């Protein structure tokens, strides 16, 4: 089992900074702002070849109210999941009543706890850590997470011995058993390499990255928790509850997924806090990183311009799409009909995306989402042969010939796959770059119908073959040169 390490402490003591330092990423949002982290965030770290899992948590200060209560609950869950707890305190702020309350709870859980005093840069470590010994947590390790000072010593002194203790003692084998094990391992390795060489890359072997995006307070985290069957992320009736993108692995029907719960995206003019700007960037990065995007829309508020703006970013990113109309419960039939009419009117240009009407709070319709998700992913990653793509191109050309350009008919020669997720079809021919947009849309829709592609956009790219005689002058052959010489000689004599 890989050891699990939880980072616990008051708000703004540097837990996310240490998380980024240990995982060597910038996955956790960091700013000088209490309460920035609200959900449990998981990451992998390594000490001398030994892996362990790091959990970043929201702060606990004992005065939680409203959404902060949920944040504290996430931290308590992380403590229960952990093998080691790094209890972080702020050396600059000194010992606080909330630190004593957290220490009391940790002692009651009987977890292996290490007291870490952060923000000791520029200070005398012995002097600033003296007060924290009164917590009764043993040795105090002084670090400066933002600069990395003391972090390596912390890892080697605390975490590495724990990881090594987890490694089982090797079992003594006889010489015959060692030889048999060696040849069995060698045979298995050769067989695996042969199979790997024979088998093509199979996207079905990879987990589907599923991003849940939308405006603030449309129910993204509620939907995430409903899918997972636990309160994995903080849910509260207040816009902006989620501030970071949370990656959560899960398995459903023997298929692996990675759920990405994101922060809400508002109009640019309303994004004022620096923290929120970082959150929006994280959301847009999550869309780029995802395979399939669930765009959650509040059915009671209808489709806004911001929904369309977010939709445009998803399409420009080439991501597969499933539209989710949340909060469908409680709407009258008349309102539901109006919402559907609005969808047909404003989203008619993306007829390839499945639309689901659900209630994340009560769970109605949520189970049907994954059928559309797997369909969209399969269509986006399906391999299609050059022969098939060329045949479809020829059928489309026979049904509706390309138009004339400057008096000449555009000629389509052949087509092949240019990429996947989204599917890209590259068409070669003469004057293809002069094709009007209407004919390009015709080809795109023809490929979509022929390949039965749903849930993902298709991109068509055109390439023209180079003219081999473009910059070449006509040169006479040796025979032609001899004839020319005789002709010139004859003309001179005749004069």
Swiss-Prot record:
Annotated GTP 2 binding lies at: 214-221, 261-265, 326-329
Q: Which residues bind GTP 1?
A: 9-16, 56-60, 118-121
Cross-referenced CDD domains? EngA1, EngA2
| Protein name from the UniProt record | GTPase Der
Which Pfam families does the entry link to? KH_dom-like, MMR_HSR1
Query: What species does this protein belong to?
Result: Pectobacterium atrosepticum (strain SCRI 1043 / ATCC BAA-672) (Erwinia carotovora subsp. atroseptica)
What are the GO BP annotations of this UniProt entry? ribosome biogenesis
Encoding gene, per UniProt annotation: der
Every EngA-type G domain range: 3-166, 208-381
Give start and end of each KH-like domain.
382-466
For the keyword Cell membrane, the answer is no
């Amino acid at each position: 089992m890989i050891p699990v390490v939880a980072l616990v402490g008051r708000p703004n003591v540097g837990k996310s900074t240490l998380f980024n330092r240990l995982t060597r990423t910038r996955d956790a949002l960091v700013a000088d702002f209490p309460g920035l982290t609200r959900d449990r965030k998981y990451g992998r770290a390594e000490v001398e070849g030994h892996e362990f899992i790091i959990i970043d948590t929201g702060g606990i200060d004992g005065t939680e109210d409203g959404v902060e209560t949920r944040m504290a609950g996430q931290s308590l869950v992380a403590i229960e999941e952990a093998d080691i707890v790094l209890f972080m305190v702020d050396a600059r702020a000194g010992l606080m009543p909330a630190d004593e309350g957290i220490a009391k709870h940790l002692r009651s859980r009987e977890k292996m706890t290490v007291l870490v005093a952060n923000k000791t840069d520029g200070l005398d470590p012995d002097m600033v850590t003296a007060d924290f010994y009164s917590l009764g947590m043993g040795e105090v390790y002084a670090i400066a997470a933002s600069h990395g000072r003391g972090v390596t010593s912390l890892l080697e002194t605390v975490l590495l011995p724990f990881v090594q203790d987890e490694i089982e003692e090797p079992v003594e084998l006889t010489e015959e058993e060692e030889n048999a094990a060696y040849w069995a391992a060698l045979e298995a390795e050769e067989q695996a390499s042969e199979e790997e060489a024979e088998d093509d890359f199979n996207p079905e072997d990879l987990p589907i990255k599923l991003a849940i995006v939308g405006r603030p307070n449309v129910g993204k985290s509620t939907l995430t928790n409903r899918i997972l069957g636990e309160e994995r992320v903080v849910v509260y009736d207040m816009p902006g509850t989620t501030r970071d993108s949370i990656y959560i692995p899960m398995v459903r029907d023997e298929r692996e997924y990675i759920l990405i719960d994101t922060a809400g995206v508002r109009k640019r003019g309303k994004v004022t806090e620096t923290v929120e700007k970082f959150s929006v960037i994280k959301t847009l990065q999550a869309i780029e990183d995802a395979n399939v995007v669930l765009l959650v829309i509040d059915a009671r508020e209808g489709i806004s311009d911001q929904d369309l703006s977010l939709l445009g970013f998803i399409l420009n990113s080439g991501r597969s799409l499933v539209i989710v109309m949340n909060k469908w419960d409680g709407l009258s039939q008349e309102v539901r009909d109006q919402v559907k009419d609005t969808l047909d009117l404003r989203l008619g240009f993306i007829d390839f995306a499945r639309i689901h009407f659900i209630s994340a709070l009560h769970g109605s319709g949520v189970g049907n989402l994954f059928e559309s998700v797997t369909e969209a992913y399969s269509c986006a990653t399906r391999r299609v042969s050059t022969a098939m793509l060329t045949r479809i191109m020829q059928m489309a050309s026979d049904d509706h010939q390309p138009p004339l350009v400057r008096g000449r008919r555009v000629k389509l020669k052949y087509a092949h796959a240019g990429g996947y997720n989204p599917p890209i079809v590259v068409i070669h021919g003469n004057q293809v770059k002069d094709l009007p947009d209407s004919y390009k849309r015709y080809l795109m829709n023809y490929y979509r119908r022929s390949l039965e592609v749903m849930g993902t956009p298709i991109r068509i790219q055109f390439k023209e073959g180079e003219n081999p005689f473009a910059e070449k002058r006509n040169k006479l052959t040796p025979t032609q040169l001899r004839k020319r010489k005789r002709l010139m000689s004859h003309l001179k004599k005749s004069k």
